[in-house]
Amino acid sequence: MTLGDLAFEETGKFAGIRALPDGKVEATYQGTGKLFGADYSSIYTGVATPHGGTLIAEFNGICTTKDGDTIVVWAHGRGRPTGSGLKASWRGGVIWKASSPKFARLNSLPGMWGVGHR
C-alpha cells in the first residue's frame, strides 16, 4: 500500500449528540462501509472541543466485518465549520488495531480520513 491508496470508505449518520458542561460536544456515529473490499459496520464515540474557530475531535470505535472480524479504531482530527449547527469539513488521522490475520496489515499503517472537503 502506498501513500494515497484508498483503504476504506464509509457512510453513516450521527446516532446521538450531547452537549457537555465544559462546552465540548460528545457524539456517537454509526456507519457502514468497505475496508480493503470487505463490508463492515461501525460505531464510534468521541468528543469535539472548540479551539480557535475550529473543532478538535478524538474518538474511539470498532468496525465489525460481515465475517465477524473486528478492528478497533482510534482517530483524531480537526474540523472547520461550514454552516450552521455542527456541520464541518473534517480531516484527521486514524490508527487501527486488528486481531484478524486478514487485516493485520492495518496494525502497521497510519491512515488519514476526511469528511466534507470534496
Question: Where do the protein language model's features map onto the residues?
Answer:
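Beta-strand-enriched cores of mature, soluble protein domains
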Residues: 1-118
